[in-house]
């Protein structure tokens, strides 16, 4: 994370203006600029565990990870620099949360790539911190305003839910498949047979759909779920609770905080980090699975058919098989054997 994103490069064009500022950085933080930016003081609040991992190493307690920011997360800040995400409801949740905590008169800066929809910030903040565009470069926009009115923020109002057969799925802004079951997960679910037993790890659990569905026909399964996203972790906990399913749910950057071995690892791994394309998580998942599968344990993932996962599976496990496919997606299966590269 040493190279700066285009959004950060636009901010650096104005770095002299921030030397006396006490800044809170938030939003879609994709680099370590908050730790390297010259200012009177800098803090970070992020909902992404992998971003917190990096920034906390550089900033210590000044970097915070949670679903909702609290007053002590923004203490003494007189400036907000918000990186616009690709997901508008996610931006709404985060900005309303943070603006409800900051004092009137706080300088508000919003920066993001044009393709992320950063222009939407003007309308979203019109009643609270009217924005003006102050720079346009690197296919990004930078907006500035001052906080004139604090919004009232109630996290409970952002919860949503939908049903899959007899299951209730709880969701929050920023969670994958927030509005319904995605086609890839649906294909993976179709391959999970009833009466599965043993310990199952759901990596990148999102709203907890895969685990809740698996538990509905395999009640003896022991579930562990993890995700880098704070909204996903909370949504998965709520989904399990809504369906009377037990399981451990926690934040982890793929396997970073996972302990022990499992009989099955299931995942619909992301190939986007924010608006950037990234295969890192899936490759880390495949390579790392050998250290978290019992002998004879199985890795089962769904992915877009065009992604180069067969090669990585073969290099790591020695083989793979495709057990279901559509025109767009494939479900890959491989098994932990002696030939797997530990």
Swiss-Prot record:
E.C. numbers: 2.1.1.172
Gene Ontology CC terms, in alphabetical order: cytoplasm
Superkingdom of this protein's organism: Bacteria
InterPro entries membership: DNA_methylase_N6_adenine_CS, Mtase_sm_N, rRNA_ssu_MeTfrase_C, RsmC/RlmG, SAM-dependent_MTases_sf, Small_mtfrase_dom
Compartments (UniProt record): Cytoplasm
Keyword S-adenosyl-L-methionine: yes
Disulfide feature: none
Catalytic EC class: transferase
Reaction(s) this enzyme catalyzes, per UniProt: guanosine(1207) in 16S rRNA + S-adenosyl-L-methionine = N(2)-methylguanosine(1207) in 16S rRNA + S-adenosyl-L-homocysteine + H(+)
Keywords: Cytoplasm, Methyltransferase, rRNA processing, S-adenosyl-L-methionine, Transferase
A single MF term (Gene Ontology): 16S rRNA (guanine(1207)-N(2))-methyltransferase activity
Stored HAMAP family: 16SrRNA_methyltr_C
Family: Belongs to the methyltransferase superfamily. RsmC family.
Self-association state and partner proteins as the record states: Monomer.
Function: Specifically methylates the guanine in position 1207 of 16S rRNA in the 30S particle.
Protein name: Ribosomal RNA small subunit methyltransferase C
Annotated gene: rsmC
């Amino acid at each position: 994370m040493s190279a700066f994103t285009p959004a950060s490069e636009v901010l650096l064009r104005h770095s002299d203006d921030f030397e006396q500022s006490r800044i809170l950085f938030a939003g879609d933080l994709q680099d370590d600029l908050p730790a390297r930016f010259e200012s009177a003081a800098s803090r970070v609040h992020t909902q992404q565990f992998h971003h917190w991992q990096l920034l906390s190493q550089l900033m210590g307690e000044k970097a915070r990870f949670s679903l909702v920011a609290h007053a002590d997360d923004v203490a003494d800040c007189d400036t907000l620099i918000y990186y616009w995400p690709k997901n508008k409801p996610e931006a709404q949740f985060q900005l309303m949360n943070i603006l409800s905590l900051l004092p009137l008169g706080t300088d508000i800066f919003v920066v993001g790539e044009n393709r992320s929809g950063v222009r939407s910030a003007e309308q979203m903040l019109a009643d609270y911190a009217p924005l003006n565009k102050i720079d346009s470069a690197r296919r990004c926009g930078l907006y500035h305003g001052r906080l004139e009115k604090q919004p009232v923020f109630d996290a409970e109002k952002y919860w949503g839910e939908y049903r899959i057969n007899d299951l209730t799925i709880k969701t929050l802004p920023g969670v994958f498949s927030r509005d319904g079951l995605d086609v890839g997960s649906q294909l993976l679910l179709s391959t999970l047979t009833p009466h599965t037993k043993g310990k199952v790890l759901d990596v990148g659990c999102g709203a907890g759909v895969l685990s809740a569905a698996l538990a509905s026909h395999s009640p003896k399964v022991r579930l562990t779920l993890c995700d880098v996203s704070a909204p996903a972790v909370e949504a998965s906990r709520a989904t399990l609770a809504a369906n009377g399913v037990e399981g451990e749910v926690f934040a982890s950057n793929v396997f970073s905080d996972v302990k022990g071995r499992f009989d099955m690892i299931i995942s619909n791994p992301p190939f986007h980090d924010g608006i950037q394309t990234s295969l890192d998580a899936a490759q880390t998942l495949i390579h790392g699975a050998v250290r978290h599968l019992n002998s004879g344990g199985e890795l089962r993932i769904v992915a877009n058919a065009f992604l180069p996962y067969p090669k990585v599976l073969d290099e790591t496990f020695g083989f793979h098989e495709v057990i279901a496919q559509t025109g767009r997606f494939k479900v890959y299966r491989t098994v932990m054997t002696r030939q797997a590269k530990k």
